[in-house]
């Protein structure tokens, strides 16, 4: 009986834990330092989570957000073409994008000549950065 109770407790804990990308959130926060030259993370209430540049869009809540949807940001044609397909950023898609943005656009925009405005490629640590970004979600509205 004790064994069953322990297994049931572990199952309940694992089911209640938030599901993030396969990466390491703490490592991703550190690696995000490479992204701050172009990107900031600013909460919906204006709280600055990561001070950074404005060359790229704010990355708060990016996981789960439709592509090219951050207000008033001037996206390139390639990412807008991919967005027209109704794509939503998920962990796997965002990881592939930050590893090689132009290759990702080539595969997902329908335009083999599409170029990304994001020239930086995150060769290592992409899953960690995406796990970090996925952990920064807007609060759910109260019922």
Roles of regions detected by a PLM:
Residues 8-16:
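Bacterial N-terminal signal peptides
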Residues 112-119:
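Surface-exposed aromatic
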Residues 1-8:
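Bacterial N-terminal signal peptides that target proteins for export
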Residues 23-87, 101-112, 137-143:
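Periplasmic/extracellular electron-transfer cofactor-ligation site
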Residues 120-124, 128-136:
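Short, exposed beta-strand-loop hairpins at the edges of beta-sheets
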Residues 17-22:
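Sec/Tat signal peptide C-region and signal peptidase I cleavage site
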Residues 87-91, 123:
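Short, solvent-exposed loop/helix junctions and linker helices
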Residues 56, 60, 91-99, 130, ...:
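An amphipathic alpha-helix signature
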């Amino acid at each position: 009986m004790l064994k069953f109770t322990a297994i049931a407790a572990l199952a309940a804990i694992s089911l209640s834990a938030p599901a993030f990308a396969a990466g390491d959130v703490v490592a991703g926060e550190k690696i995000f330092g490479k992204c701050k030259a172009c990107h900031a993370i600013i909460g919906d209430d204006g709280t600055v989570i990561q001070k950074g540049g404005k060359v790229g869009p704010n990355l708060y809540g990016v996981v789960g957000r439709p592509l090219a949807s951050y207000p008033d940001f001037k996206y390139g044609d390639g990412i807008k073409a991919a967005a027209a397909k109704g794509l939503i950023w998920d962990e796997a898609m965002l990881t592939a994008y930050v590893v090689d943005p132009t290759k990702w656009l080539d595969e997902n925009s329908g335009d083999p000549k599409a170029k990304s405005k994001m020239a930086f490629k995150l060769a290592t640590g992409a899953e960690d950065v995406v796990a970090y970004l996925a952990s920064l979600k807007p609060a759910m509205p109260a019922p």
